[in-house]
Design a protein with these regions (language model features):
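N-terminal "assembly arms/tails" that initiate or stabilize quaternary assembly
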Residues: 1-74, 403
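Short, Lys/Arg-rich flexible segments
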Residues: 2-33, 90-95, 108, 116-133, ...
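Short, low-complexity, charged/polar segments at coil/turn and helix-coil boundaries
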Residues: 33-42, 146-181
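Long, contiguous amphipathic alpha-helices that act as assembly "spine/axial" helices in icosahedral shell
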Residues: 50, 76-134, 140, 157-174, ...
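Alpha-helical scaffold segments that mediate packing/assembly in large oligomeric complexes
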Residues: 95-103, 107-161, 174, 214-244, ...
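Autoprocessing Asn-cyclization modules and mimics
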Residues: 176-295, 299, 312-319, 405-407
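Internal mixed-charge
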Residues: 203, 211, 273-402
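Structural signal for terminal/edge beta-strands and the immediately following C-terminal loop/tail
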Residues: 400-410
Length: 410
């Protein structure tokens, strides 16, 4: 009995499952799929509107204190179309699906998933506005300890991050260092065995651990000194006027402002700890505008202990000459591996159905909220039959405060 050829539908179905399962970062994101795109096909630039969680304040006493529901939303754009294009021989298509998957599809999907994950990481890592670091007295970043990861967990808790299903993504080199130092730390015997045999942490310190090659190596700015020049006059300010700074700040740097402490996002009470902000626009030496996230939303009176407000982020407005400090400041630029602890809901990856051209050999499948399209066609110019597999996707950090950088020295 003659072998049957693998069909494009079989190839696509196998490819999408391999794609989702071959990259740890993609597996541990919030993945969304909008079937509205399936009616006419999605294209680069298609958008999804995402509502953010509402926030309210609590009254004390029987008197009603009505507050508006001030809904916030953001837009996720399907901005990137990635794919892999190959020529299959008839001999390839006569293989069993298992053989074809191992020899051809697995390396294709591993690289495609890695490329997509790299794009998402590049768009996400430098939006994180929290950091828990292990540093020496001079401010030099060291390899994180168990206390560093637990400090990150505490920071996430203060920001009302969901406790269940938290993840820790490490650079592979960081993972190796951490497994060595934490391998015997109050773990069940089976977990210690897994660490010994596999060289991975798996589950520890309230999170599921994994390593991924997409983790960024980040270089800080050379910032040494800077002060605010006036008090922000608008609640929710993200652009702060400063005196000409000494040194530089990079997008993704973490800074604090003297006298501006974080608040618990549920109780709105001050934590007594400096609120960390992420720099969103790079600053050169002598620049005078500091752009940050989150926005500065103090109490209604602008002073610590004042009446709470919706979406409050800090306990008080800064003084007009408050000092700005680079959190990783040791007097020079530092390069570190930007591992982080996070809730999967912090980052959303969305995909849409690409259109299916008429009169072509095509297939499209969805698996675990990821859509992939395949097209096979004959190229008359090169006398080849080629197949292309495409994913149209976009990503957005919905809640940067639900992530916390755990840096490791390079």
């Amino acid at each position: 009995m003659a072998n049957s050829l693998l069909t494009i539908s079989m190839i696509t179905r196998e490819a999408i499952e391999l794609f989702v399962n071959s990259n740890a970062f993609i597996k541990n994101l919030d993945r969304q799929y909008d079937d509205d795109f399936g009616k006419k096909g999605a294209k680069i630039g298609s958008q999804l509107r995402i509502r953010l969680p509402n926030d309210y304040t609590v009254r004390t006493g029987p008197a009603v204190s009505i507050q508006d529901t001030a809904e916030q939303q953001t837009v996720l754009t399907l901005a990137t179309q990635d794919g892999v294009d190959v020529s299959f021989s008839t001999a390839d298509l006569l293989l069993s699906l298992d053989d074809f998957s191992e020899r051809v599809m697995l390396p294709m999907m591993n690289n495609l998933a890695g490329g997509v994950a790299g794009t998402i990481m590049a768009n996400s890592a430098n939006t994180i506005c929290n950091m828990a670091q292990n540093a020496d007295a001079a401010g030099n970043i060291l390899t994180p300890t168990s206390g560093t990861y637990l400090d990150a967990a505490a920071t996430l808790a203060i920001n009302s991050t969901p406790i269940s299903a938290q993840k820790i993504i490490n650079d592979p080199r960081t993972e190796a260092r951490v497994v060595t130092s934490l391998s015997g730390l109050l773990n069940p015997t089976t977990a210690i065995s897994d660490q010994y045999y596999e060289g991975m942490m798996y589950k520890a310190l309230g999170a599921t651990w994994f390593s991924d090659q997409t983790v960024l190596k980040f270089t800080t700015g050379t910032f040494t000194t800077g002060t605010l020049n006036g008090v922000p006059t608008v609640t929710g300010s993200t652009a702060l006027t400063v005196s000409a700074i000494t040194g530089t700040l990079a997008v993704g740097d973490i800074v604090t402002i003297a006298g501006v402490n974080a608040v618990n996002r549920v109780t709105k009470l001050s934590t007594g700890e400096p609120r960390q902000f992420v720099v969103t626009v790079a600053m050169v030496a002598n620049a005078t505008v500091l752009n940050v996230y989150p926005s500065l939303v103090p109490s209604s009176t602008g002073v610590a202990g004042g009446p709470a407000v919706q979406y409050q982020t800090v306990d008080a407005s800064p003084a007009s000459n408050a000092t700005v400090t680079l959190y990783t400041n040791n007097g020079a630029a530092q390069t570190y591996r930007k591992s982080f602890r996070y809730a999967p809901q912090a980052i959303t990856m969305a995909t849409g159905d690409l259109p299916l051209p008429a009169n072509k050999v095509v297939a499209r499948h969805k698996y675990d909220n990821v859509s992939m399209r395949a097209i096979t066609d004959y190229m008359i110019g090169t006398d080849q039959e080629i197949t292309r597999l495409d994913v149209l996707f976009g990503s957005l950090v919905i809640r940067p405060e639900w992530m916390c950088v755990v840096p490791d020295k390079v």
